[in-house]
Amino acid sequence: FVSSHPMAGTEYSGPEAAIPNLFDQKYTVLCETERSDPDAVELVERMFRSIPMKIARLDPTSHDVHTAYISHISHISSFALALTVLSKEKDEGRIFELASSGFSSTVRLAKSSPDMWVPIFRQNRDNVLDVLDEHINQLSRFRSLLIKKDFDTFYQLIQEANSIRKIIS
């Protein structure tokens, strides 16, 4: 056994959701390789590199913290936004006719299976709660600025958030 987590996927699951080249140049995380047979680790590394994937080694704690930030909170945010809009949709049937690519990309993850995600949230609960608290804090900052009509600071926060462009292309 070699503990590994390919860091690529879509909102769909099962064989019918297969996408050619999904894993190309994405990372897979290997954890606790020192507890695995060295030959098995070498085989797994060769397999992932042949896809071709990049390999990162993390301890399980770091893996769980990082995935809470870059994956799990994105899913919760998408689920929450979808529920927010679906509750409004009950009163205004035409709302989805107005939705375009920005909305679609933001709620794409809400199509993910609860069969997959509830166990992930259960297993990584403490880290997800920490990240969710920080996310709620950020949302509260934006809310407070809107209430105060402090659009200069609102602008600055958006500019600060835009710096993610330099990290993620």
What are these regions (language model features)?
Residues 92-160:
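Interdomain hinge/lid region at the active-site interface
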Residues 163-169:
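Long, positively charged, glycine-interspersed low-complexity recognition regions
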Residues 11, 36-37, 128:
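Alpha-helix N-cap/loop-to-helix initiation residues
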Residues 1-16:
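Rossmann-like NAD(P)(H) cofactor-binding subdomain of soluble oxidoreductases
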Residues 17-22, 119:
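Short, flexible, solvent-exposed loop/turn segments with mixed acidic/basic and small polar residues
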Residues 20-108:
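Internal alpha-helical scaffold of NAD(P)-dependent oxidoreductase catalytic cores
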